[in-house]
Amino acid sequence: MRIQRIYHRKNPIINGAPPLRPLGWSNIQIFVQVWEHLERWGVSDVTGVWGFFNGLITVIALRQRYAGHAKQALITAAGFRQGDMKTYYVTVDEDIDPTNLNEVLWAMCTRVDPASSIDIIRDAWTADLDPRVSPARREAGDLTVGRMLINACRPFTWRDQFPKSNVFSSEERKLVETKWRDLLEKAAKKRSAWSGVS
């Protein structure tokens, strides 16, 4: 190896991302492990597990079978050892795609009662890389943080009276798009002209 030049700058411009800034897809393998953990500990009828922001948010979709089923899934997932830096755990019903952040947020906005659907776990173990641990706590060896458990499922005890979701299936959506394509494209062009977007 031959070194011909070394370049140096006193105040470099670094185009990197801050710690834990999402760089892309979450680690799929960890969510497979969370799903296996749920099943191993008796949480049945899980229909999907996914995460966002490098897994800091874990979403569990399930078909509720009994009162407390969603809470059981949340507590079990929060106790998963490899989930050390995961902070937010959300359960959604099986009609929500856990890989679609818009659907998850919609469920949170329409099915969560902040007074009764959210629980905080204090002093949960975390990794020494977790930026939320203060320097004083880190020095004392206190590697604990809180975790938020969010039940974004329809309330089990009155789910039959809960308003139904009104959603087109993908097949119905394609039929409408095919039938009305010209009109939809004209409307989109008008909208972009009004907003100044080209």
Each predicted region: which residue ranges?
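Charged, compositionally biased interaction regions
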Residues: 1-198
